[in-house]
Each structure stands twice: as C-alpha cells, then as structure tokens.
Amino acid sequence: MSLKSKTVTIEGGRDNGKKFIIHEMPAAKVDEWAMRALMALAGAGVDVPEANEGMMGLAKVAFSALGNVPYEKARPLLNELIDCVEYVPSGGTPRPIDLNIGDIEDFTNIWKLRKEVFNLHIDFLQQGNSPN
C-alpha cells in the first residue's frame, strides 16, 4: 500500500485557487515526529491525555497545544509538517514549497496546510471519531 496524498485548493484571499499536494510521511518518520511532539508537549507542562484515550486523545490536544511548547522545540516540528507539502504552480509540476518566494502569501494558509498534514496522518483515527 502506498503513502497517502491529498490535494488542497485554497479558497479566497491572496492565495485563492492555489493548489497544494499534502504527502504522508513514512511510518518511521511520523512515529519519530509524534514521539518528539509528545515529549515536547509533556516537557512544556501540557496535560497529555490519559493512556486509555490513546492516539485519539493525543490528536485532540496536539495541534492546539503546540502553542505551549517553547519556540525552539516547536519550530522544527512545524517545519516538518510543511515539508510534507508541495506547491502546484499554475500549469506546472509540483515542487517543494518555497516560503521565501511567495508560494504562500497569506500566513494563515501556512497554518491551514500544517493542520491538513496533521489531519492526513491521523485520519485513520477519525473513523467515527473526531479529534476536534
């Protein structure tokens, strides 16, 4: 079975109509990312979900709770989420996002794409349950 991907089209604002492809990380990489995120959350004093809530509990708090993690620890985690996104220029070939040349003009869309990446990795947990 191949890794999942998803196309996201931005609606409205300065990035209206821009398309991005979200790619799933390989299992070992996402496991390592999740462990570092969990440790960063716990280290920042975030109340990590009870063991009986499992990954669904973590999914409920992880993305919003990253705001409690010191910048030095959160930034690499957030950057790794953006590394899963490719920009599809109009009529062009998908390529890694370059935030320095304006692939994304509205910073809120950077956060939207990060959340889309996170959700792609936990969608199997959402079968009948929602982390939001």
Report the location of each language-model feature:
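Short, charged/polar N-terminal "headpieces" of proteins
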Residues: 1-51, 121-132
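Generic secondary-structure boundary/loop-capping signal
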Residues: 22, 63, 96-98
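C-terminal charged interaction modules
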Residues: 75-132
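Structured domain cores in non-transmembrane regions
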Residues: 32-76
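Short, compositionally biased low-complexity segments
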Residues: 5-11, 48-56, 83-94
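Non-transmembrane, amphipathic alpha-helical segments
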Residues: 22, 66, 102-105
